[in-house]
């Protein structure tokens, strides 16, 4: 029989008492009393923060949005089918944040930055808050570096600078996404990180964009954040903030980034759905009162940082869809007032065969020529004015039978200028090609060429300059300036080519 040693027992008890810790873990727990339509109402969560993440019994995560006197209204980041009345909910004490790292480049992720492309997990050791403060006034610099889109119409007349916010607005099927994707393609080799955020789109449309970028070797510097049409409204609402957070990670490392939000109308609709289900009072077009703040706090995060912060930039190209060209609706007017200009795409122009279908008259860039290379500034000055005068004359000439020679000449040049702005999708032009195209049109070298042959002639001109006059392209690439030497080489080439045409 084992003999019990009282001394041993008492020493073990003393040891246990000495090691005892009075640490009390406080968990804020509540109970679900109503759930449905992606919304849960919870009783008992007394010390919860606005925007805090909540964890339900089945593992579903929610966000506390409405803090009321007797309950908390939360939106669910999932279907929440296993959540029942009486289920317990735990406050996590955390605000929504996502992992960030260089490994995200070339990947397709969802609104929570989790990969959905089947290429395995993404390694990251750092996280950033989805909602973070925009850079302050002292942290910024004025926009002064160009961000080339590769589209003659945009780069010449509605220039975009690094750190700018330029709205792309128009009816459905007018080529809004095409302009955005072309801009991503044109950043190849320019050390710009691109983030494409697809909100409420068909999975097939997103797959098309991914394939288009992959075919052209542009996926290596692009991140795609996808919240498809069948994802819960909460994730569609969060997707743009996730895109901005990923871009911010690179911006604060001194890199240049471009974010495309395609499109913010769908994000506003998702937010309206959430707000109405939470019984927030509806305002104009049934949107909640803070829908302006929804977009302003997102777009204000785009900036050109000061040199002290590394000089990085985030350029935002938000897209907004209009109904029947109505830019005076609630969401379009809100986003127009937040951004630094807009590119307006018209259905009528698109249907008349002019692509990209930009309405030059009401499109504007509030940054202007500060965001243009010297070469473009030199040749593009007269282009917008001449096109505006041409549009006015064209409308007038439909009613006038006999026109004087000067008017006829202006109409004939205008039709050729409009022709040189036409561009096929996914074929952005380099700066030297854009300059030669505009120079030829503005200085009358295209006047003797039939309108239907203008585009073929311009292709021939680019090929001729590349093969026979390589110095022209070299000067523009090295200096970004249209020097006297470059101008004389271009004039020489145009005389040689038009001489052979006439």
From Swiss-Prot:
Residues that coordinate or bind ATP: 170-177
List the Pfam families hit by this protein, alphabetically: ATP-synt_ab (PF00006), ATP-synt_ab_C (PF00306), ATP-synt_ab_N (PF02874)
The cellular location(s) given in this protein's UniProt record come to: Plastid, Chloroplast thylakoid membrane
* Predominant localisation class: plastid
What molecular functions are annotated in GO for this chain? Answer: ADP binding; ATP binding; proton-transporting ATP synthase activity, rotational mechanism
Q: InterPro entries, per this entry? A: ATP_synth_asu-like_sf, ATP_synth_asu_C, ATP_synth_asu_C_sf, ATP_synth_F1_a_nt-bd_dom, ATP_synth_F1_asu, ATPase_a/bsu_AS, ATPase_F1/V1/A1_a/bsu_N, ATPase_F1/V1/A1_a/bsu_N_sf
Indicate yes or no for the key word Ligase: no
SUPFAM superfamilies the record matches:
C-terminal domain of alpha and beta subunits of F1 ATP synthase (SSF47917), N-terminal domain of alpha and beta subunits of F1 ATP synthase (SSF50615), P-loop containing nucleoside triphosphate hydrolases (SSF52540)
Tell me which residues are marked as the site Required for activity: 363
Q: Membrane topology per the record? A: Peripheral membrane protein
Give the UniProt keywords, A-Z.
ATP synthesis, ATP-binding, CF(1), Chloroplast, Hydrogen ion transport, Ion transport, Membrane, Nucleotide-binding, Plastid, Thylakoid, Translocase, Transport
Q: State its Enzyme Commission number(s).
A: 7.1.2.2
Cellular component (GO) terms are: chloroplast thylakoid membrane; proton-transporting ATP synthase complex
Q: Which domain of life is it from?
A: Eukaryota
* EC primary class: translocase
Reaction equation(s) it catalyzes: ATP + H2O + 4 H(+)(in) = ADP + phosphate + 5 H(+)(out)
What CDD domains is this protein classified in? ATP-synt_F1_alpha_C, ATP-synt_F1_alpha_N, F1-ATPase_alpha_CD
Subunit (UniProt) = F-type ATPases have 2 components, CF(1) - the catalytic core - and CF(0) - the membrane proton channel. CF(1) has five subunits: alpha(3), beta(3), gamma(1), delta(1), epsilon(1). CF(0) has four main subunits: a, b, b' and c.
Family in the record = Belongs to the ATPase alpha/beta chains family.
Protein's recorded name: ATP synthase subunit alpha, chloroplastic
Gene name?
A: atpA
